[in-house]
C-alpha cells in the first residue's frame, strides 16, 4: 500500500475506534503511531511519539490549561461560581436563557485571557454547567452552549493558534489580533441571539425566572466584589503585560483560594478535591492535544495534505470556489485534530496557494480560524464536544443536539466575512496606519 492509502484507512480506523468508546486522545495516538510506523519504521514511530509527548508536556504555553482549570474548580467548590451565577441570575434571570447568555459573555472574557478552545470548554464545563443545572436548564442547552463557547477561546485575542499562524505566514501578530476582534464579538453576539430565540420558542430549555428588584441586584454585586477585583487584576495584568497567561492563571487561582478561605466557603479537603479534579481535567485535555499531534505527524507523512493542495491548484475553478474547498479541508481537519495541531500541519501547505489566488493573508487567517472552529464542534470527533462529554458524562447525542444551532451562527459569520472582508480588515487598517 502507498502512503495515501494508509492515510485514508487511518482516518476510517480512527473514527471506528472512537465509536467503540475508546478515549479520543489515545485513539489518535494509537492510529498515528501504527500508521507512522507502517510508512517509516517502528523505531521512527516510537521516536516520534516520544518527541510529541515531550513537546506537548514541556510547552510553556500549555501550562495555562491546568492553572485556569484549577481556578475554575476552586471557584466552583468554594461557592464563588455559585455567587457569580446568582448575581448573573438577578440581572439576566428574567430573560429566556439568561444564564446561558452569561456563559457566552464569560467565555468571551475568559478566551481573551487563555486563547485556548479546550481550556475554555474544560473550565466552563466544570463551572457553568452545574450552575445551569441548579436553575433548571436543559442539558441540551447547557452542554451545547459550553462546547460552542469554547470556540471563542481561539477567536478572541490573544489566541495561540493566531500566533502560530502569524509565525508560519510571517504576518503581524498585532494585526491578526486586531482582525479577530470584530469576528469574535460577532460570534458571541450571534450566540446570544440564538439562545434568546431558541429559549423563547422552547422555554423549558432555559426557563426564565422572576424579575429581580434593583435593590436585590445591587446586593448581589456586593457578594461578588472580591471576585470582580480578582478578575480586574488578572485581566488588567494580562493586558498590561505584567503577567503571562499562565502567571495570570496562577495569580487568579491563588487569589480565588484566599478569597474562598477568607469567606469560609472552602477548607483543605475542598482544595485537595479541586486539585484532583483539575489534574484529571488538565491531563485529559493534554492527552487530547498530544494524541492530535501524533496523528497530525502521521497524516503529514502520508502526503495527503500536499496531494490535496496540488489537486486543488489544478482544478479549473474560480478562486472563490478554490477558497471554499480549502475551507472545507480546514473544517474537516478541525473535526479530527486539535485546532492548533491542524494549523501547524496545514497552513504551510495552503497559504502559498492563497497568496497565488490574491487573498489577503490577514483576512485568510480569520477565515480559516472560523472554519476550524466549526470543525471542533462537528462530528465525527469534535474535540470540544469530547471535552464537555468527558467532564459532564453527558451523552454525545445530547451535546451534538445542543451545538447544532450554534454551528449555524458560526457558518453565518464565515459567510459575512467572505462577503464583507472589512469585518476583519477594518481595525488593522484603521489602527495601524
Language model segments and positions:
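Alpha-helical transmembrane segments of multi-pass membrane transport proteins
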Residues: 1-433
Amino acid at each position: 500500500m502507498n502512503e495515501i492509502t494508509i492515510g485514508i484507512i487511518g482516518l476510517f480506523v480512527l473514527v471506528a475506534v472512537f465509536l467503540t468508546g475508546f478515549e479520543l486522545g489515545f485513539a489518535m495516538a494509537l492510529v498515528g503511531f501504527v500508521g507512522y510506523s507502517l510508512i517509516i519504521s517502528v523505531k521512527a514511530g516510537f521516536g516520534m511519539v516520544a518527541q510529541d509527548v515531550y513537546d506537548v508536556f514541556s510547552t510553556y504555553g500549555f501550562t495555562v490549561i491546568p492553572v485556569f482549570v484549577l481556578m475554575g474548580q476552586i471557584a466552583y467548590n468554594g461557592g464563588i461560581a455559585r455567587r457569580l451565577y446568582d448575581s448573573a441570575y438577578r440581572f439576566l434571570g428574567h430573560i429566556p436563557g439568561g444564564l446561558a447568555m452569561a456563559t457566552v459573555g464569560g467565555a468571551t472574557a475568559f478566551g481573551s485571557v487563555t486563547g485556548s478552545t479546550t481550556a475554555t470548554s474544560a473550565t466552563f464545563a466544570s463551572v457553568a454547567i452545574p450552575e445551569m443545572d441548579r436553575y433548571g436548564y436543559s442539558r441540551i442547552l447547557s452542554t451545547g452552549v459550553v462546547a460552542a463557547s469554547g470556540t471563542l477561546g481561539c477567536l478572541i485575542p490573544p489566541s495561540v493558534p493566531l500566533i502560530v499562524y502569524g509565525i508560519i505566514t510571517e504576518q503581524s501578530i498585532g494585526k491578526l489580533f486586531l482582525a479577530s476582534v470584530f469576528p469574535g464579538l460577532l460570534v458571541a453576539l450571534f450566540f446570544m441571539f440564538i439562545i434568546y430565540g431558541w429559549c423563547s420558542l422552547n422555554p423549558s430549555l432555559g426557563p426564565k425566572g422572576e424579575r429581580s428588584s434593583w435593590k436585590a441586584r445591587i446586593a448581589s454585586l456586593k457578594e461578588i466584589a472580591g471576585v470582580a477585583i480578582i478578575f480586574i487584576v488578572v485581566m488588567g495584568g494580562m493586558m498590561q503585560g505584567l503577567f503571562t497567561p499562565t502567571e495570570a492563571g496562577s495569580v487568579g487561582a491563588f487569589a480565588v483560594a484566599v478569597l474562598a478561605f477568607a469567606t469560609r466557603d472552602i477548607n483543605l479537603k475542598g482544595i485537595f478535591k479541586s486539585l484532583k479534579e483539575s489534574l484529571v481535567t488538565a491531563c485529559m485535555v493534554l492527552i487530547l492535544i498530544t494524541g492530535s499531534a501524533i496523528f497530525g505527524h502521521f497524516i503529514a507523512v502520508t502526503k495527503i495534505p500536499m496531494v490535496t493542495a496540488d489537486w486543488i491548484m489544478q482544478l479549473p475553478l474560480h478562486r472563490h470556489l478554490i477558497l471554499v474547498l480549502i475551507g472545507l479541508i480546514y473544517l474537516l481537519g478541525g473535526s479530527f485534530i486539535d485546532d492548533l495541531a491542524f494549523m501547524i500541519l496545514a497552513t504551510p501547505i495552503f497559504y502559498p496557494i492563497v497568496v497565488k489566488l490574491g487573498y489577503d493573508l490577514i483576512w485568510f487567517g480569520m477565515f480559516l480560524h472560523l472554519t476550524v472552529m466549526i470543525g471542533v464542534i462537528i462530528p465525527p470527533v469534535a474535540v470540544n464536544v469530547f471535552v464537555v462529554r468527558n467532564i459532564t458524562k453527558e451523552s454525545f447525542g445530547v451535546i451534538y443536539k445542543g451545538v447544532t444551532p450554534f454551528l449555524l451562527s458560526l457558518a453565518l459569520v464565515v459567510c459575512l466575512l467572505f462577503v464583507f472582508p472589512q469585518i476583519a480588515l477594518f481595525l488593522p487598517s484603521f489602527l495601524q496606519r
